[in-house]
């Protein structure tokens, strides 16, 4: 592994990548080639915009899981003219052969599977540091860590007390990394912040952070909420999780899902896909929800809607998918049955109170699979240390569904980079006609043929023949 730099001055002297093993590049390239055949949206954008180079001049700081599918995204951005630097947004989600292949192509990549928290924040800093002393002008984010780093760092420039009281292990590493950077360059973050033309955000949790900044008047640049494009949230979040959740659980444990009792906490799009996946393999699935509408949806689908504290001792497989924190707390963990499997498919690692288990005996079974002995003598199986199980214990969503999400990301980057002056410092979603375009680009691959409206039919329902076909408020 290449050493992490300790000062900005050393950047140009170091190789512009940090990967586990650059010799994995050939393996990664073979898988990239296969993934491209399953990602028609991204390939269509290369064909449509490749000669125009609409991202020429864009310097994109990318913080998103460094997987094979992300490699196809990165190479699409480059094909459209962008300069790109990349880090993963999760310490366990990198596929090392994917990182090696992209690094070998000349794109600066800073990502390894199983990073420490110190390494994670060092690598996130590296995507903000161009070797020529320049700065990024765009951020492509997943979970909001890159955006949040810039914002918190700029606050710390004028008031270092914001770094005084870290609330957990992750904040301890984050705050230390900011202090180190400020000691080298006291205006680093504000300089980055002023150079950013726009941010595109991939996931629910990161979008929530953006809306919080907008509400408080602190958002300093326009942002596009990619997550709430229909072709992202109703496909990636639902159908992606429907396949990748059980993939992660079974790779980690080899457990028979049929006959088990599973509890999915949260019944949004991610929870819906997760519940379907477990039911599809024969589990008895229950749902925990705070939202009466989501709870009613779950009940109408035939799931029992329950409270965690009333069923915790009966559950074999726990899955958190809420985007909240302290969902499974210490009081729940210590009551779990012997060999209960505990995992999370929400973005951050604080849905499960893993920190409260640190003083109990841990036995590592294999990477991202730990046996923890409770005071009762029961053992639980914790997957990916409470981080994303589908990426920590498997390889994430399939290429086809990620093509939907990443096609939205590319369109959002083009929109903000080329038309950023037309946007206020607010959070936007992509217009409906682009959402429909993303869907169209994926139909032929799966043999779907659209029916076409006649002009008379279109006039009858007051829509254009070519769409969009639904109003913005329509719920799919």
UniProtKB/Swiss-Prot annotation:
It catalyses: S-adenosyl-L-homocysteine + H2O = L-homocysteine + adenosine. GO terms for biological process: L-homocysteine biosynthetic process; one-carbon metabolic process; S-adenosylmethionine cycle. InterPro entries: Adenosylhomocyst_ase-like_sf (IPR042172), Adenosylhomocysteinase-like (IPR000043), Ado_hCys_hydrolase_NAD-bd (IPR015878), NAD(P)-bd_dom_sf (IPR036291), S-Ado-L-homoCys_hydrolase_CS (IPR020082). Pfam families: AdoHcyase (PF05221), AdoHcyase_NAD (PF00670). Its main location: cytoplasm. PANTHER family: ADENOSYLHOMOCYSTEINASE (PTHR23420:SF0). This is Adenosylhomocysteinase. It comes from Prochlorococcus marinus (strain MIT 9313).
């Amino acid at each position: 592994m290449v050493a992490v730099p300790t000062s900005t001055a050393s950047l140009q002297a170091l190789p512009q990548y940090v990967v586990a093993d650059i010799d994995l590049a050939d393996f990664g390239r073979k898988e990239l080639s296969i993934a491209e055949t399953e990602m028609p949206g991204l390939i269509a954008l290369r064909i449509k915009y490749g000669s125009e180079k609409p991202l020429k001049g864009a310097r994109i700081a990318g913080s998103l899981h460094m997987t094979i599918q992300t490699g196809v995204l990165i190479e699409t951005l480059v094909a459209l003219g962008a300069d790109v630097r990349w880090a993963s947004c999760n310490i366990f989600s990198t596929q090392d052969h994917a990182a090696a292949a992209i690094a070998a192509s000349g794109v600066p990549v800073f990502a390894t599977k199983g990073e420490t928290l110190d390494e994670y924040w060092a690598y996130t800093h590296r995507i903000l540091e161009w070797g020529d002393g320049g700065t990024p002008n765009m951020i492509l984010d997943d979970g909001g860590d890159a955006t949040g780093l810039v914002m918190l760092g700029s606050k710390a420039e004028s008031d270092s007390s914001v770094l005084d009281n870290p609330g957990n292990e992750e904040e301890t590493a984050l705050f230390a990394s900011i202090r180190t950077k400020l000691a080298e360059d006291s205006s680093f973050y504000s300089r980055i912040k002023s150079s950013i033309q726009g941010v595109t955000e991939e996931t629910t949790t990161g979008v929530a952070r953006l809306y919080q900044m907008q509400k408080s008047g602190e958002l300093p640049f326009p942002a596009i909420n990619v997550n709430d494009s229909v072709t992202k949230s109703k496909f990636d979040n639902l159908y992606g999780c429907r396949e990748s959740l059980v993939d992660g659980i079974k790779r980690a444990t080899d457990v028979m899902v049929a006959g088990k009792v599973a509890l999915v906490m949260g019944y949004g799009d991610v929870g819906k896909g997760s519940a379907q996946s477990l039911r599809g393999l024969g589990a008895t699935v229950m749902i925990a929800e705070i939202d009466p509408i989501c709870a009613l949806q779950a009940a109408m689908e035939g799931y029992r809607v329950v409270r965690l504290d009333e069923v915790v001792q009966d559950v074999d497989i726990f899955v958190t998918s809420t985007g909240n924190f302290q969902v499974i707390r210490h009081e729940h963990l210590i009551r779990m049955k012997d060999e209960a499997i505990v995992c999370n498919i929400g973005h951050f690692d604080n849905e499960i109170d893993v920190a409260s288990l640190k003083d109990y005996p841990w036995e590592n079974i294999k990477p991202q699979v730990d046996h923890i002995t409770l005071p009762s003598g029961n053992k639980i199986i914790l997957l990916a240390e409470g981080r994303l199980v589908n990426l920590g214990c498997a390889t994430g969503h399939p290429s086809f569904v990620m093509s939907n999400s990443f096609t939205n990301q590319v369109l959002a980057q083009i929109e903000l980079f080329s038309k950023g002056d037309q946007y206020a410092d607010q959070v936007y979603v992509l217009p409906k006609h682009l959402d429909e375009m993303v869907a169209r680009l994926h139909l032929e691959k799966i043999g779907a043929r659209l029916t076409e409206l006649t002009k008379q039919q279109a006039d009858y329902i007051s829509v254009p023949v070519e769409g969009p076909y639904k109003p913005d408020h329509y719920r799919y």
